[in-house]
């Protein structure tokens, strides 16, 4: 079976679109940490970092979304994805539904 029939059969399956996770609701007041304990840990942390005189490093960036360049539908319940990451890694993923 060729690629075009699979894309026509599943038009909403856009695997190249970036995926954004759903937004989380804020924690209720009883689930938040107490301000007093938070301030204590912050003051201890700031003293340790001031002695080293180093600027805090930003957290590492999340990798970019992988791009699916080619996918095929094999039979009624098997999909094969050919994934190419921006770093050059190539992965073939076969999913049996």
From Swiss-Prot:
Protein role: Contributes to multiple aspects of the viral life cycle including viral genome amplification, suppression of suprabasal cell differentiation and egress of newly formed virions. Induces host cell cycle arrest at the G2 phase by associating with and preventing the nuclear entry of host CDK1/cyclin B1 complexes. Inhibits cellular DNA replication by preventing loading of host replication licensing proteins MCM2 and MCM7 onto chromatin. Within the cytoplasm, associates with host kinase SRPK1, a splicing factor regulator, and inhibits its activity.
The record's account of how the chain is modified after translation: Phosphorylated by host ERK. The phosphorylation triggers a structural change that enhances keratin binding and protein stability.
Entry's Gene Ontology cellular component terms: host cell cytoplasm; host cell nucleus
Localization of this protein: Host cytoplasm; Host nucleus
Compositionally biased region (Low complexity): 46-55
Ranges of biased composition (kind: Basic and acidic residues): 1-11, 32-45
Misc. remarks from the entry: The major E4 form is first synthesized as an E1^E4 fusion protein from spliced E1^E4 transcripts, such that the first few amino acids of the E4 protein are derived from the N terminus of E1.
Phosphoprotein found in the keyword field: yes
Main localization (coarse): host cell
Bias (Basic residues): 22-31
Protein name per UniProt: Protein E4
Keywords: Early protein, Host cytoplasm, Host G2/M cell cycle arrest by virus, Host nucleus, Host-virus interaction, Modulation of host cell cycle by virus, Phosphoprotein
Pfam family, one: Pap_E4
């Amino acid at each position: 079976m060729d690629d075009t029939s699979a894309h026509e059969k599943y038009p909403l399956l856009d695997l190249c679109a970036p995926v954004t996770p759903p937004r989380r609701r804020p924690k209720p007041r009883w689930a938040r940490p107490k301000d007093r304990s938070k301030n204590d840990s912050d003051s201890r942390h700031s003293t340790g970092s001031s002695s080293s005189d180093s600027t805090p490093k930003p957290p590492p960036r999340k990798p970019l979304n992988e791009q699916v360049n080619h996918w095929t539908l094999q039979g009624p319940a098997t999909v094969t994805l050919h994934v190419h990451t921006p770093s050059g890694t190539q992965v073939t993923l076969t999913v049996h539904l």
